[in-house]
From Swiss-Prot:
Transmembrane helix among keywords: no
Entry-linked Gene3D superfamilies: Ribosomal protein l15e (3.40.1120.10)
Entries under PROSITE patterns matching the protein: RIBOSOMAL_L15E
Organism of derivation: Saccharolobus islandicus (strain L.S.2.15 / Lassen #1) (Sulfolobus islandicus)
One GO cellular component term noted in the UniProt record for this chain: cytosolic large ribosomal subunit
Entry GO MF terms: RNA binding; structural constituent of ribosome
NCBIfam families, per the entry: PRK04243.1
UniProt-annotated stretches for the region Disordered: 170-201
Protein name: Large ribosomal subunit protein eL15
Ranges of compositional bias, category Basic residues: 170-188
Composition-biased stretches (Basic and acidic residues): 189-201
UniProt-listed Pfam families: Ribosomal_L15e
SUPFAM superfamilies in the cross-refs: Ribosomal proteins S24e, L23 and L15e
GO biological processes: cytoplasmic translation
Amino acid sequence: MTLSVYHYIENTWNSEEWKKGVLRQRFIEWRKEPSIVRLAKPTRLNRARSLGYKAKQGFVIVRVRVRRGGLNKPRPNKGRRPKRMGVYGYGPAKGYKWIAEERAARKYPNLEVLGSYYVGEDGLYKYYEIIMVDPSHPVIKNDPNYKWLQDPSNRNRVFRGLTSAGKKARGLRKSKGFKGTVKHKWSRKQKEREEKKRHEASKYYRLQRYDKIPGK
């Protein structure tokens, strides 16, 4: 079987030589650029094509840079131990890909987000490329595969969590696979009942429940 060019693009992108050589040099250049940059063509053509990108008028590729790490929570000035200060270990409820899509949509309010894909990350930032479509462009209007973006129900779809990254952050994909089935829920509840029964049968539970002296 003859392999397509996208197969070789993916293998090249996943190779360690590419990551340590070309991609690392690109990260150095991307840090000097603005956080939102419009591109002439996608960096990962195989991922862009799999998400619906076409090399035609009306399609725009935007690279967005998002800061890595958790939230910068303010450190309280009242007394408590450092573990309970609530400064470290807290991240955003949204995914970084969804945040990147929203920033691109605010930068280009006349475009709609079709999808996005991961490009890479360094020590400070994560980089995503956003596929955006102009629903008012004549080429898009006459394309039966993309004219659904003109529907008012799809306006500002990224801000309503209708993109792939938004649905994932909203938890709409948890039912896919074994974890969302009734059998999995039943087995999980059965495991909780067994753990509770085992705990109640322990000596610590009996002493804690019956050996307490009232008023002390």
